[in-house]
Each structure stands twice: as C-alpha cells, then as structure tokens.
UniProtKB/Swiss-Prot annotation:
Residues annotated with N-acetylmethionine modification: 1
Keywords: Acetylation, Cytoplasm, Hydrolase, Phosphoprotein
Taxonomy of the source species: Eukaryota, Metazoa, Chordata, Craniata, Vertebrata
Chief subcellular location: cytoplasm
Catalytic activity, EC: 3.4.19.1
Protein name, as recorded: Acylamino-acid-releasing enzyme
Self-association state and partner proteins as the record states: Homotetramer.
Family per record: Belongs to the peptidase S9C family.
Length: 732
C-alpha cells in the first residue's frame, strides 16, 4: 500500500512551510487610558505587537495593531480592530506613561556595520514626536539593553523621567604605537587636550570583557540610567554594589529611588538566558543619598519584581535553590512600608490530583496586579498545559482562570484595571487574541472571554495528551511514584494508521516542557502525514519540584528511558508504523535523541539533532553554563575548584558519545557556529566519530547562528533539510 505521507516533492513541503510560517506570534500588549464617551459609554484601546517570519526578506518582522474594547466596568460589551496592522521598524522597546498621554520608544537607526547603528530614545505625545534623544551621540553609556533579562524602560510616576539599563561606557583604548598628528595652527589649549594621557588607555584595545553568555554577547556591565525628559540630561545612577549587575528596574513609590534586581557576577559570569537560578537579590537605591538597601535574601535567585497599583507592595518570583537551571518558584510579597517579606505561594513538591502544581514562569507579566492591589495574575505550565491563575496575596489562595477549557494553552499579556489581555492557542490553532475582565474574588473561574483576533484552525491535525506511568523497574528510588506526559499530534483520518510514520521530539532544557500551544514544526510534520510525539519526560517543568529534582544525576538514563517507554506505548496503542520512527531534538532534546539511537538502534530509522549535547565532560570548559554539566551529572557545582577524575568519568559515562559503537541510524546534524550554550564542537565530535564508523551522517553548519537556530533563513533551511532527510531515510 502507498504510504500516506506528503513527501513526494520538496516543493510541496516548501509551499506548506511558506503558508504556515505566515502565522504571526503575539509578543506584547498594553492598554490605553479609560475613555468615557459623551453618551456615558466607556472604552479602552488595546495596543498589540506581533512578529512574523518574512521569507522574502529572510527576517522576523514586527508590526502592531490596535483594537477598541467597549465595556461596562465588569464585562466587555463590544470589541474589534481599529484599522490595519502597521510594521514597526527599528523599535527595540516601548512603554506608555502611567497616564497614557505619552509613549517612550527606544529605536535603532542607521547602518548595520560596526559603529553605524545608533539608538534614539523618543517621546511621543498625541499625534507628534515630542522629543528625540540620540543616545549614541551623547556618549553617556554604551548600547541600551532591550532584552527581557536585564532590560527595562520605566516612566517615573511623575512622568518627568525615564529609567533604562545600558552597557557601561568603556574607556577608549589604543595601540602603544598610536600617534596623532598635531595641528600646528591649533591653540595651546587644543594641543594640551590632545596630549592628555587619559584620552585613551594604551594597550587596552584587546582587553577581554566577560559577557552574560548565549544571546547576551557584548552585554557585560549594565548600569542604571535616568533621562530627564524636559532637559535631556542623562544620569548614570551611583550606589549600585560593584559585585552585582542591575536590571529589571522600576521607580520606587514617590520617585525617591529605584528598585532593581542585582545579579552576582563574581568570580565570573555564567550564562543567564533560560537560567533562572543565577544568584540575585532585590535592591533599592536612593536617588538623593545614593544609599543602596538590600530588600530580599541575598543567597537565592529572584526575578521580575512588580509594584502594586497602590504603590504599597512589590511581588516577585524567588527560586529557593541555585540548582537546577529552572525549577518551581515561590511568589513573594514585600511590603514597602512595613519592610516585611512573606511567601504568598510556596514551592509545590508534587501535584495532588488536579490541584495546582506550582509556578514555572520565568517572568511575571509587566502588568499582573488587579485594580485593588490584592490579587496577582500570571500564566504557568501545569503539566502539559499552560493556564492563567489568580493569587490572592492576602491569604495565598491560587485559582485557575482557564481550567475546564478546551485543553489549549494560555499566556497573559497584561492586565490593567482588571481588564486582561491574553493569548490562546492549541497545537492545531495558531494564537488568538482575547480580552476579559477579572471577576471579583471567589468568582475567578467565570471569566467571559471575548476574541479580538481569531485564527483559523489548521485542518486535519488531531491532538491529545497521554499520561504515562514508568514501569516498576524504571522508578526513581528517591522520587517514586512520578508520572509524566506526552502530547500526540496525528493526521486526521488517515486511510491506514499502520502506514503512518512517527517523529519523536523530546524537548530541550532539560527543565522545560512542551505545552498544548501552537508550534510550527510539529504542525508542519503532522500536515505532511507524520504522527508527532512530544514527550515531557520526568524532569520537565509543570509537574512539581520532585519531578524536576529527580533528573539531575540521572540524565542519559531516566530521560532516555521515559522517551523510549512513551514511544513503545504509543506505537502499541495507536498502531502506527513501528518500522518508520524518527527522532528530532535540539539541545538536551538532541542529547536524548543521540542517546536513543545509541541505546535503541533498532527502533529509529532516522534522526535530526540540532546543537545537541554530545559529551558533557568536553563541554564543561567551553559552554557558558559549566554548572549545568556538573549539576545534571549529579554533582554539586563550585566555581573555585575543578571536578575530580570520578566526576569527569561520570559526565562522560552519561553522554551520548559513549554509545557511538552501537549507532547505525542515519543522522542529520544542524549546528550554529555562534552557539555559546552548546558549542558547535560538540556536534563536530559526534560527526567525526560517526564518519569513522561509516554511519550515514550529514552536517549543516550555520555560520552566524546561535543555539536556537531561530533566524528565519536558518530555521527555514533547517526544516527543509530535515524534511528531505526524513524523506530519504524513511522513504516516501
């Protein structure tokens, strides 16, 4: 019987990719001020920002669209778009002022060559640009941080000043042999200025500046900066402790100072992207005296402090352990006036029944407080879904706002005056934009959602969640009784299920998870006729802290066994073609995939690995997160000592490279040459070992790409090559 897979021509796959990749993704939303019409009606504008792949320009474009939401104070009466979308070129950050009358925009302009790109901070009011400041020309600091780790753009409550984070201005450096020609017609003062020894430091042009790792290259020493909107004067704040790097800052009550998160950078910086375990604390620096005050425990890790509307309390996430790299967090509350800190929501060791399984988001939304400053709203993974929750900060109760829905996943974009803006999607439904009012306390489950922007469901994609219990011989002795889940996508109504091939995708991390949200690659594969199995093995987030802690020391074993067990169970229950199973994984998902083709070579006909971890031992000295190597191998990390021989041996023993002699599955490797997280030499090590043994292997090396391989040109090329690899080795 002919196999029911849409792989007969590469052009068909390219056309399908071109169509599905046009689905835009929501990146941000903000709410305008309340407006009352002459007839007494009330409405607010919703400003949304989106991104979309542009295959003609080979870049991600950003655009905005506005909507009007008419309401009666408790529910939405009418909502709809206000005009078409507009591309926003060059915008790095933007923020509405507290009153909504002004908007600050950080914009890049100029060329793309070194030193050609400039940054401008603009202030807009109504229908005009009120101010524009050339930050690059002012030379008060280096480039402004626009990332979500350190970056911020915060209006003072008085709307007279703007707070942001930028790279500290570096001293000029020149060669020992640099000479300057003196103008004989210059004045004595000008000649003296040119001769000043402090104009440039000789011999420092090649001094190494340590940065914050993957996706944070050139970000080394952040400083807090304040712009006086009226005068244009920029001040770099003093008083920040020298041993920490500041970020995520906002104005304290009364504008008397600034609250910020400070990350320790001694004795050296570790990669911070996707690592919520970096030692950090909450600080307050007084603008008048320059005194800096510690507001939280300084031995833990914190993130995303958010000031309540009444300016009395600060809520933030706190991670009670510096290992592993991501985990269940506490929700903490700091009272500004009593100086008392309390834990509102604690770490959840294990989910009981359908109860709350803990907080796993890495950042709280910028707008997360209810109007009465009593409740906090956020989204978090709960097993294989992502739901919205409201927490009563007085009593600590957690209530789901989206439980009992259709099984998809939610993301909160913002909440203001109890009006929530959220995103909803499923594996077969691209993101839709919704608004709804937060009900009064005790009635949170009765949110009435109204769609602002609907998306068309993608036909012929069926999906569901499978709960899996490891067999007794695979139980974790210390953390017994843990289950895990997998999300299964399959083509709608195939003529013969036994002819359907399956692609298995373990996630990276390892402490992350798949949720039932829109994902381009799985949807593409499913539309081509593949069943796609997304496995949340033990160690994934969303299943309780015990599940996360069960994996360090057991990588290469527990995670691999879980994925293999999931594959065998699904093949047995669904009767897919067991002779046509392939693997596709990136980072730790690539680590698991390469383990599987070594430990279970008879199961898999093809494998695609993106920036995989191959040899934990050899990665230790080159990655931006050496602590990951040690901790996941099962040992405590210390920055002041090297592992002993037994630790090196254990790291090697838990690595896919150990199983090279058994590998016979054809492998496609995709590596980013600028990857700081899993340096591309990891994949090269595996490539050479397979070539030596005549195993079919192909290597794609993307020169300017990083760990995620997410650049539009790279992403599209890697997908098409993956499809062709599957076509070649699974057969069409």
């Amino acid at each position: 019987m002919e196999r029911q897979v849409l792989l007969s021509e590469p052009e068909e796959a390219a056309a399908l990719y071109r169509g599905l990749s046009r689905q835009p993704a929501l990146s941000a939303a903000c709410l305008g001020p309340e407006v009352t019409t002459q007839y007494g009606g009330q409405y607010r504008t919703v400003h949304t920002e989106w991104t979309q792949r542009d295959l003609e320009r080979m870049e991600n474009i950003r655009f905005c669209r506005q909507y009007l939401v008419f309401h009666d104070g408790d529910s939405v009466v009418f909502a709809g778009p206000a005009g078409n979308s507009v591309e926003t070129r060059g915008e790095l950050l933007s923020r509405e002022s507290p009153s909504g009358t002004m908007k600050a925009v950080l914009r890049k302009a100029g060329g793309t060559g070194p030193g050609e790109e400039k940054q401008f901070l603009e202030v807009w009011e109504k229908n005009r640009k009120l101010k524009s400041f050339n930050l690059s020309a002012l030379e008060k600091h280096g480039p402004v941080y626009e990332d979500d780790c350190f970056g911020c753009l915060s209006w003072s409550h008085s709307e007279t000043h703007l707070l942001y984070v930028a790279e500290k201005k570096r001293p000029k450096a020149e060669s020992f042999f640099q000479t300057k020609a003196l103008d004989v017609s210059a004045s004595d003062d000008e000649i003296a200025r040119l001769k000043k020894p402090d104009q440039a430091i000789k011999g420092d042009q090649f001094v190494f500046y340590e940065d914050w790792g993957e996706n944070m290259v050139s970000k080394s020493i952040p400083v807090l900066c304040v712009l006086d909107v009226e005068s244009g004067n920029i001040s770099v704040l003093e008083g920040v402790p020298e041993n920490v790097s500041p970020g995520q800052a906002f104005w304290a009550p009364g504008d008397a100072g600034v609250v910020f998160v400070g990350w320790w950078h001694e004795p050296f910086r570790l990669g911070i992207r996707f690592c919520t375990n970096r030692r950090s604390a909450l600080y307050y620096v007084d603008l008048i005296g320059g005194k800096c005050e510690l507001l939280s425990d300084d031995s833990l890790a914190v993130s995303s402090p958010r000031l309540s509307p009444d300016q009395c309390r600060i809520v933030y996430l706190q991670y009670p352990s510096l290992i592993p790299h991501h985990q269940c967090s506490q929700l903490c509350l700091y009272d500004w006036y009593t100086k008392v800190t309390s834990v509102v929501v604690d770490v959840v060791p294990r989910q009981l029944g359908e109860n709350f399984s803990g907080i796993y988001c890495s950042l709280l939304p910028l707008g997360c407080w209810s109007a009465d400053s009593q409740r906090v709203v956020f989204d978090s993974a709960q097993r294989s879904r992502q739901d919205l929750f409201a927490v009563d900060t007085q009593v600590g109760t957690v209530t789901s706002l989206t439980a009992g829905g259709s099984g998809g996943s939610w993301k909160l974009l913002t909440i203001d005056q109890d009006l929530m803006v959220a995103q909803f999607s499923t594996p077969s439904l691209p993101p839709t934009l919704k608004v709804g009012f937060l009900p009064s306390a005790g009635k949170e489950q009765s949110v009435l959602w109204v769609s602002l922007e609907e998306a068309e469901p993608i036909p012929d994609i069926h999906w569901g969640i499978r709960v899996l219990q490891p067999p007794p011989e695979q139980e974790n002795v210390q953390y017994a009784g843990l289950d895990f889940e997998a999300i299964l996508l399959q083509p709608g109504s195939p003529p013969d299920k036994t002819q359907v091939p399956m692609v298995v995708m373990p996630h990276g991390g390892p402490h992350s998870s798949f949720v039932t949200a829109w994902m381009l690659f799985p949807a593409m594969l499913c539309k081509m006729g593949f069943a796609v199995l997304l496995v949340n093995y033990r160690g994934s987030t969303g299943f309780g802290q015990d599940s996360i802690l069960s994996l360090p020391g057991n990588v290469g074993h527990q995670d691999v066994k879980d994925v293999q067990f999931a594959v065998e169970q699904v093949l047995q229950e669904e009767h897919f073609d067991a002779s046509h199973v392939a693997l596709m994984g990136g980072s730790h998902g690539g680590f698991i995939s390469c383990h599987l083709i070594g430990q279970y070579p008879e199961t898999y006909r093809a494998c695609v690995a993106r920036n995989p971890v191959i040899n934990i031992a050899s990665m230790l000295g080159s990655t931006d997160i050496p602590d990951w190597c040690v901790v996941e191998a099962g040992f405590p990390f210390s920055s002041d000592c090297l592992p002993d021989l037994s630790v090196w041996a254990e790291m090697l023993d838990k690595s896919p490279i150990r199983y090279i002699p058994q590998v016979k599955t054809p492998l496609l490797l995709m590596l980013g040459q600028e990857d700081r997280r899993v340096p591309f030499k990891q994949g090269m090590e595996y490539y050479r070992a397979l070539k030596t043994r005549n195993v079919p292997v192909r290597l794609l090396l993307y020169p300017k790409s990083t760990h995620a391989l997410s650049e539009v040109e790279v992403e599209s090329d890697s997908f098409m090559n993956a499809v062709l690899w599957l076509r070649t080795h699974l057969g069409s």
